[in-house]
Amino acid sequence: MDFPTRFDVIVIGGGHAGTEAALAAARMGVKTLLLTHNVETLGQMSCNPAIGGIGKSHLVKEIDALGGAMAEATDKGGIQFRILNSRKGPAVRATRAQADRVLYKAAIRHTLENQPNLWIFQQACDDLIVEQDQVRGVVTQMGLRFHADNVVLTTGTFLGGLIHIGLENYSGGRAGDPPSIALARRLRELPLRVGRLKTGTPPRIDGRSVDFSVMTEQPGDTPIPVMSFLGSKEQHPEQVSCWITHTNARTHEIIAANLDRSPMYSGVIEGIGPRYCPSIEDKIHRFADKESHQVFLEPEGLTTHELYPNGISTSLPFDVQLQIVRSIRGMENAHIVRPGYAIEYDFFDPRDLRYSLETKVIGGLFFAGQINGTTGYEEAGAQGLLAGANAALRSQGKDSWCPRRDEAYIGVLVDDLITLGTQEPYRMFTSRAEYRLILREDNADLRLTEKGRELGLVDDRRWAAFEAKREGIEREEQRLKSTWVRPNTPQGDAIAERFGTPLTHEYNLLNLLSRPEIDYAGLVEITGDAVDNPQVAEQVEIRTKYAGYIDRQQEEIARLRASEDTRLPVDIDYLGISGLSKEIQNKLNQARPETLGQASRIPGVTPAAISLLLIHLKKRASGRQLEQSA
């Protein structure tokens, strides 16, 4: 049977990628369907109960700047907030929040159910309707057909999902949920490169069976940070601490003695796991010289005793898991509520995608999240928003959009994936970005909100707050620039005494703020007229202190942008370009890069090859001009 309503965009999956994709498309005014196998699991945090961290919070803030839901849901569900790298420069500072799973999921569901243009339907998707290399809709488990020319797949770990505990395994999308077998089989029929990846999760612990008195308490920061640009600490629920303990020699002995019972080390698991979130057995094997590893006990929520022991993800048999847990200080009598496990799943080579996250072989079919080889809620949410927005743009007959590497971490993420591909679950770090001084988490709105408004992603409430902030920054910078302090005056003497900086002549306050020893709060305490908005004060201080470095980075970006953005024709014949080696011809022909900049980042493509490409493009353009004049 055909569903009576035709949609512009259909999103498959209600995880972090799917919810952001559906919300983005609906915000842009197109008729959107979110199809999920279970409405009760919309926005569920399948692994650790945390949002943000190094590189990841930058993505969350960018999602927020573009009108997404993740940051605001974190503020409503966050039970501990911390700023990581707070003593380092602003480029690498990151916000991290522990979240109450129930509160976070409720916030996401509330947002979904109150979003205009968005329909939600509970059914598993088993098939795609494809006609002449163009997607036309989907078919559910009960044979119901939904029609749309744009479909976003956000299947997480469900495609061919296989759960491992010891040498036993069974089909599943995650613990308690069925896998997507029929859809996985259908996707494998398409001309797309497919592989297997693996991720894992630790056993959950009953907090009543833990001795916290022998552990190190890790409270949140004061004052409490916020995640969203629209957030406030008044939104936060009760705040709680995490606790730190360590593995020990006994723990490592138990693991080493049972590696033959590990599905990873016995060859049962074929998929590659995340390098930067390894299982405890992987840590013991790879870092055999380390005597201990940290374990962070993270509360799962305010209304449960469950704890998430971050650092001991494992797929060893349950009896070994119990020995491991009880060998750790403070957990000698611990009760395991849920066993840890590993899960293998299908992913598709992201090099088969365009910058819009649309597949190159099937028009209107978009992929986002773990299906593209990434790991993490934040990476998934960022891709989901972009894919949903581009699906909406396509339905409106408009050009696709993706931020450049110098505009957003989302741009870095997508460019890395579609240019380089990935052999292991991809995680975002600040070190992946060349222009991280410009791509700070604190200025994500200044970089992206205006574009989001243009696309239709940003509502009036966010736009008004953004304009007020932007105007506040400009006004305060102008005030500091036009306010002067002279030596041998009460203000001049107070500045000299507080900062140890005698004034030799007249300075404006902006000049003084550029000095490393002078901070904004201390300066305006002496001179008066501080701004009320802490986001404005933060921006003024960072922009002033790092102005020289930022200007140099902007100049470098401007130099590179001309060649970076040069489009490569869809029909270009790389095999016919003389001067290119066969190896480079084949690499370019396989990757089919969209721009010269993307071509330059393909492994093995040399600067000389890029120069030859540029010459070829100029010859091609001049040849067409001659044809037109003739």
From Swiss-Prot:
Main subcellular location: cytoplasm
Arranged from A to Z, the UniProt key words for this protein are: Cytoplasm, FAD, Flavoprotein, NAD, tRNA processing
Q: Name one GO molecular function term.
A: flavin adenine dinucleotide binding
Q: Where does FAD bind?
A: G13, G14, G15, H16, A17, G18
| Cellular component terms per the entry's GO annotation | cytosol
Indicate whether Amino-acid biosynthesis appears among the record's keywords.
Answer: no
Names of required cofactors? FAD
Q: Which HAMAP family match?
A: MnmG_GidA (MF_00129)
Q: What is this protein called?
A: tRNA uridine 5-carboxymethylaminomethyl modification enzyme MnmG
Q: Which gene encodes it?
A: mnmG
